[in-house]
Curated annotation (Swiss-Prot):
Family annotation (SUPFAM superfamilies): PRTase-like (SSF53271)
UniProt key word Cytoplasm: yes
Descriptive protein name: Adenine phosphoribosyltransferase
Pathway: Purine metabolism; AMP biosynthesis via salvage pathway; AMP from adenine: step 1/1
Keyword Thylakoid listed: no
SS bond partners: none
Known partners and oligomeric status: Homodimer.
The organism of origin for this protein: Vibrio campbellii (strain ATCC BAA-1116)
GO CC, alphabetical: cytoplasm
InterPro entries, alphabetized: Ade_phspho_trans, PRibTrfase_dom, PRTase-like, UPRTase/APRTase
Catalysed reactions listed for this entry: AMP + diphosphate = 5-phospho-alpha-D-ribose 1-diphosphate + adenine
Length: 181
């Protein structure tokens, strides 16, 4: 991973002040997606890191995790599994709830998407509190999958999600770190 590549990716991510509410500095990965060179560099970095680890599935969380997880899965030659909000998946699912700052949310996965012994890489765009990936990890493990790695484009380390996920036994990797919330 070169400093030049990281700089390209980092500079393609726009920061939006006071979105979605006052006091939040939002890191917008859609601007990265608009830059084909930065988007490809992001996928290439993830492929280089994970290509020889023997994963059998990549799981992406709704919704921006799909944008990085699906192309990564294709490049790794493995299946992609979406984890979605309730009612969005047509086959039988299991669900896992998790706490938000003000309330509770739930994620679902198809019951047949992960089989016993699958070696799973979890991917999302941004790591803040870690609640989404904790719930995703619990779903995968409930189905018998082995998950030890989680990859992100962005980490906000001040919020502490990386420590939370490390407490679950996950190796956390992020391409870029940004200060703030």
């Amino acid at each position: 991973m070169t400093t030049e590549t990281i700089s390209l990716i980092r500079s393609s991510i726009k920061s939006i002040q006071d979105y979605p509410k006052p006091g939040i500095l939002f890191r917008d990965v859609t601007s990265l997606l608009e830059d084909a060179k930065a988007y490809q560099a992001t996928i290439n970095l993830l492929v280089d890191r994970y290509k020889d680890m023997g994963f059998t599935k990549v799981v992406g969380t709704e919704a921006r995790g799909f944008l990085f997880g699906a192309p990564l899965a294709l490049e790794l030659g493995v299946g992609f599994v979406p984890v979605r909000k309730p009612g969005k998946l047509p086959r039988p699912t299991i669900a896992q709830s998790y706490e938000l700052e003000y309330g509770v949310d739930t994620l679902e996965i198809h019951t047949d998407a992960i089989v016993e012994g699958d070696k799973v890489l979890v991917v999302d765009d941004l790591l803040a509190t870690g609640g989404t990936i904790e719930a995703t990890t619990k779903l995968i493990r409930q189905l018998g999958g082995e998950v030890e790695h989680a990859a992100f484009v962005i980490n906000l380390p001040e919020i502490g999600g990386d420590k939370r996920l490390e407490g679950l036994g996950l190796n956390v990797y992020s391409i870029c770190e940004f200060e703030g919330h």
